[in-house]
Amino acid sequence: MPLLDSFKVDHTRMHAPAVRVAKTMTTPKGDTITVFDLRFCVPNKEILPGKGIHTLEHLFAGFMRDHLNGNGVEIIDISPMGCRTGFYMSLIGTPSEQQVADAWLASMQDVLNVKDQSKIPELNEYQCGTYQMHSLAEAQQIAQNVLARKVAVNKNEELTLDEGLLNA
């Protein structure tokens, strides 16, 4: 099985919260797709709580679109990482890491402005596979943590995993 790009970076050197360009590709029609690693937690030291990450998934997707879409950028998807340390965001376009960081911070402020759980989008059995597994309080704690710590940039050239550590 091929080694995926996300496993070729040294997770022991990642900063969090931080944004990283995980991958770029060009479609046959010439569009650039950029995948961002939005790292909320320091790998192997912190983890996002299950209910909080799920609620954040519902809120973050819309708020990031509000702040980042436009001027040649359109978000395709924002999905939580299986390791629960962040999200991957795929989009059409090439916004800078700073543009993404600014949109992320604005989105976290939006999360704090949600007044109660009934305001979480798609929070029903028809639109959500585990609609009872949510916590606005946990999502807001995650947002507060990001806002308090700010968002750095993780550079791929600083995170390249030493060949000797691959499959160690």
UniProtKB/Swiss-Prot annotation:
Q: Where does Fe cation bind?
A: 54, 58, 128
Q: Does the keyword Signal apply?
A: no
> Pfam families, from UniProt?
LuxS
The record's cofactor note says: Binds 1 Fe cation per subunit.
The EC number(s) this enzyme carries? 4.4.1.21
Gene3D superfamilies per record:
S-ribosylhomocysteinase (LuxS)
Keywords, A to Z, come to: Autoinducer synthesis, Iron, Lyase, Metal-binding, Quorum sensing
What GO MF annotations does this protein's record show?
A: iron ion binding; S-ribosylhomocysteine lyase activity
**Cofactor entry:** Fe cation
Q: Tell me which GO cellular component terms the UniProt record holds.
A: cytosol
Q: How does it assemble?
A: Homodimer.
Instruction: Return the PANTHER family for the record.
Output: S-RIBOSYLHOMOCYSTEINE LYASE
Spell out the protein name for this chain: S-ribosylhomocysteine lyase
